[in-house]
Amino acid sequence: MVKVIASSVRKGNVLEVDGKLYVVLTAQNFHPGKGTPVTQIDMRRIVDGVKVSERWRTTEQVERAFVEDVNHQFLYEDGEGFHFMNPENYDQIVVDVETMGDQKAYLQEGMTCVISMYEGVALALDLPRHVTLEIMETEPVVKGQTASSSYKPAMLSNGIRTLVPPHINAGTRVVIATEDNSYVERAKD
């Protein structure tokens, strides 16, 4: 275990609090006008999946567990969960639906992800920063509509809705940021 200050904790880190391990879901630093800056951390207990919210002063020390980040390739999904393979030794692991969370929408066969492992158990999953998806449907552009926002809603091939520029139409392949579902650019393929 390593002691770190609360403000340096990030999503996906594993913390030990009161002898139990937690995976960080969100970590936000707040600097109120008066008073001490604090870090609000939402976590999930690894043993039973209970979600907990903690608030620490940004300079407080918290214990971070050592986790191993290992590249894995996504194979398939079934009733057990999501199956991944380590390309170095061909070991396969199953990641449950709760650990995957909302990220499952971006998984594509053969995609390489970084899985955080603690004593052989998958705790968190990091997708590539950008994925290429196809626009399934989008609204038509209204000419001369310059007073409002220049982005329009669109439905992606994985079922997620996002905003795209007016020149993007259905059938176009685009690059999307997995962190916030935002449009990055038109795909170059």
UniProtKB/Swiss-Prot annotation:
<keyword id="KW-0963">Cytoplasm</keyword>
<comment type="similarity">
    <text>Belongs to the elongation factor P family.</text>
</comment>
<dbReference type="GO" id="GO:0003746">
    <property type="term" value="F:translation elongation factor activity"/>
</dbReference>
<dbReference type="InterPro" id="IPR020599">
    <property type="entry name" value="Transl_elong_fac_P/YeiP"/>
</dbReference>
<comment type="pathway">
    <text>Protein biosynthesis; polypeptide chain elongation.</text>
</comment>
<keyword id="KW-0251">Elongation factor</keyword>
<dbReference type="InterPro" id="IPR008991">
    <property type="entry name" value="Translation_prot_SH3-like_sf"/>
</dbReference>
<dbReference type="Pfam" id="PF01132">
    <property type="entry name" value="EFP"/>
</dbReference>
<dbReference type="InterPro" id="IPR011768">
    <property type="entry name" value="Transl_elongation_fac_P"/>
</dbReference>
<dbReference type="InterPro" id="IPR013185">
    <property type="entry name" value="Transl_elong_KOW-like"/>
</dbReference>
<dbReference type="GO" id="GO:0043043">
    <property type="term" value="P:peptide biosynthetic process"/>
</dbReference>
<dbReference type="InterPro" id="IPR014722">
    <property type="entry name" value="Rib_uL2_dom2"/>
</dbReference>
<protein>
    <recommendedName>
        <fullName>Elongation factor P</fullName>
    </recommendedName>
</protein>
<dbReference type="InterPro" id="IPR013852">
    <property type="entry name" value="Transl_elong_P/YeiP_CS"/>
</dbReference>
<dbReference type="Pfam" id="PF09285">
    <property type="entry name" value="Elong-fact-P_C"/>
</dbReference>
<comment type="function">
    <text>Involved in peptide bond synthesis. Stimulates efficient translation and peptide-bond synthesis on native or reconstituted 70S ribosomes in vitro. Probably functions indirectly by altering the affinity of the ribosome for aminoacyl-tRNA, thus increasing their reactivity as acceptors for peptidyl transferase.</text>
</comment>
<dbReference type="GO" id="GO:0005737">
    <property type="term" value="C:cytoplasm"/>
</dbReference>
<dbReference type="Pfam" id="PF08207">
    <property type="entry name" value="EFP_N"/>
</dbReference>
<dbReference type="InterPro" id="IPR001059">
    <property type="entry name" value="Transl_elong_P/YeiP_cen"/>
</dbReference>
<keyword id="KW-0648">Protein biosynthesis</keyword>
<dbReference type="InterPro" id="IPR015365">
    <property type="entry name" value="Elong-fact-P_C"/>
</dbReference>
<dbReference type="InterPro" id="IPR012340">
    <property type="entry name" value="NA-bd_OB-fold"/>
</dbReference>
